């Protein structure tokens, strides 16, 4: 059932990927096996009637350098959600930034994140719902 029907049954896939004070990154989608099983995970959504999903590609993977974007880890999952008719609530940045950026306190964060958000919107124009940060 599409969100514009007046009702949606939503869930989210935990996609935190913070860098700890030790410098070690903890990627929750990696830890729970989602990268290896995303097709199965998305199939389970459909099997229980979920029609909206808070989901986003890992910002640190898709924005590997200033003005450089790598959508290779995002394209197939995003397209599969679209094919399943699941409304994506795009989680653009969830508890972590690319290593080159340094952190949320970096004065350049808003500029680089804005660039990423623009590129995401151009790449996936069918996504209309967002949780930016």
Model-derived segments and spans:
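N-terminal carbohydrate-binding accessory modules
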Residues: 1-50
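Substrate-binding cleft and catalytic face of glycoside hydrolase catalytic domains
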Residues: 18, 44-133
């Amino acid at each position: 059932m599409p969100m514009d029907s007046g009702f949606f049954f939503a869930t989210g896939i935990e996609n935190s990927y913070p860098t700890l004070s030790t410098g070690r990154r903890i990627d929750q989608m990696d830890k729970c096996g989602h990268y290896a099983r995303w097709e199965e995970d998305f199939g389970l959504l459909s099997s229980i009637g979920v029609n909206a999903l808070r989901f986003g590609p890992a910002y640190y993977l898709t924005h590997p350098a200033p003005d450089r974007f790598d959508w290779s880890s995002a394209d197939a999952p995003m397209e599969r959600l679209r094919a399943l008719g699941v409304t994506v609530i795009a989680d653009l940045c969830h508890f972590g930034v690319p290593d080159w950026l340094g952190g949320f306190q970096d004065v350049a964060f808003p500029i680089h994140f804005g660039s990423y958000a623009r590129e995401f919107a151009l790449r996936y124009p069918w996504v209309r719902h967002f949780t930016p940060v």
